[in-house]
């Protein structure tokens, strides 16, 4: 074989190896978030665009699908179920739930969804691989409640819902009292990848709220003593927003590489400690505040009536709570716990666990009987 032919073969092999490496890097992120289950069991290493068997109920197929992404943690599974049930019972729209969880929780979740009134919902269970967070999150004992991996699922919406142009994300400690279609139809301004409810958009403009609570701003989440934060020229007094409920334009999200931007700031925080030492809320909030600074639309404040979990007392009137489109128990006092504001409103949407693994904790209950 001539030297020229050998050279050509070597170059051809080099090109093939380069293309294989490029293909592997392109798929690596998607492979970390694998769809979990159909009725037959774990899907395992199926690609992210694998479609599990949806549980069908009669819908108008001409209606646009409304993807709703929600996390399902084992110790908060009752919250996820109640949120899903409240959405399902209050709409006739074509909703598909993308439920993000771990493989170890999938069977428990599936048995709950297959019981009672939830049998007719359409859903897909997606496994969240914690390897996705390596090098992006550091353990902090003071933020233990916020460090749970599933709370970061909201950063990866285009991967969780790969074929959708738009999606809704919501936390598991919410109840929806309005038609989810209205939230989905929230108008987003050109160039905006998401719409949030701002912490200063006080719903008290519509009704007087007793004990309106703290108004948060950027300085409550970011360390303005750090040069990297100061260089961003973000006003410390800028009103923050709540990322527990938002509408995302996934086409714009992908165009702006929002996920990559969020991961960048997560890594920089691990290296430099950019978040406030007295963090006002979830650890997921600071990178979102940076990436979406003055670049987000707003949702109707009645679609995120929050702080119901900030204390056991009732900060809102019964009339206001009834009028709210979405109730959010963000804070330490969850409605499935021993004491929470308007727990009775939440409990109307709760479906008891058929396996008996999850139980509500109530003041009148003997703690020895709690599973």
Swiss-Prot record:
The keyword Amino-acid biosynthesis does not apply. Its EC number is 2.4.1.-. The keyword Acetylation does not apply. It is an enzyme of class 2 (transferase). It is found in: Membrane. Residues 1-5 are cytoplasmic. Glycans are attached at residue 257. It holds the Pfam family Glyco_transf_8. It is a single-pass type II membrane protein. Belongs to the glycosyltransferase 8 family. This is Glycosyltransferase 8 domain-containing protein 1. The lineage of its organism: Eukaryota, Metazoa, Chordata, Craniata, Vertebrata.
């Amino acid at each position: 074989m001539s030297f020229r032919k050998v050279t050509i073969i070597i170059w051809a092999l080099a090109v093939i190896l380069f293309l294989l490496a490029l293909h592997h890097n392109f798929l690596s992120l998607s492979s970390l978030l694998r769809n979990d289950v159909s009725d037959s069991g774990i899907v395992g290493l199926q690609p992210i665009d694998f479609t599990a068997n949806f549980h069908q109920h009669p819908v108008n197929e001409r209606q646009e699908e409304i993807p709703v992404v929600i996390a399902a943690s084992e110790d908060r599974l009752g919250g996820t179920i109640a949120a899903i049930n409240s959405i399902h019972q209050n709409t006739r729209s074509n909703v598909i739930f993308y439920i993000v969880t771990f493989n170890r929780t999938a069977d428990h979740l599936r048995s709950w969804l297959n019981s009672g009134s939830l049998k007719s919902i359409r859903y897909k269970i997606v496994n969240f691989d914690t390897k996705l967070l390596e090098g992006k999150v550091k353990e902090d004992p003071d933020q233990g409640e916020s460090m749970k991996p599933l709370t970061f699922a909201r950063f990866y919406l285009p991967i969780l819902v790969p074929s959708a142009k738009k999606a809704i994300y919501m936390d598991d400690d919410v109840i929806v009292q309005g038609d989810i279609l209205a939230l989905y139809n929230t108008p987003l301004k050109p160039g905006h990848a998401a719409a949030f409810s701002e912490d200063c958009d006080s719903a008290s403009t519509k009704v007087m709220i007793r004990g309106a609570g703290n108004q948060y701003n950027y300085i409550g989440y970011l360390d303005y003593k750090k040069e990297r934060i100061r260089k961003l020229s973000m006003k410390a007094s800028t009103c923050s927003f709540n990322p527990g409920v938002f509408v995302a334009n996934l086409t714009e999200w992908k165009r702006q590489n929002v996920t990559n931007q969020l991961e960048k700031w997560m890594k920089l925080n691990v290296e430099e400690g950019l978040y406030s030492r007295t963090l006002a809320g979830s650890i997921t909030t600071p990178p979102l505040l940076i990436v979406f600074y003055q670049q987000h639309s707003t949702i109707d404040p009645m679609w995120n009536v929050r702080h119901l979990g900030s204390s056991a007392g009732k900060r809102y009137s019964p009339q206001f709570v009834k009028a709210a489109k979405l109730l959010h128990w963000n804070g330490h006092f969850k409605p499935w716990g021993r004491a929470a504001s308007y727990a009775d409103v939440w409990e109307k949407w709760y479906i008891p666990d058929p396996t008996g693994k999850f139980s509500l904790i109530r003041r009148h209950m003997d703690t020895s009987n709690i599973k």
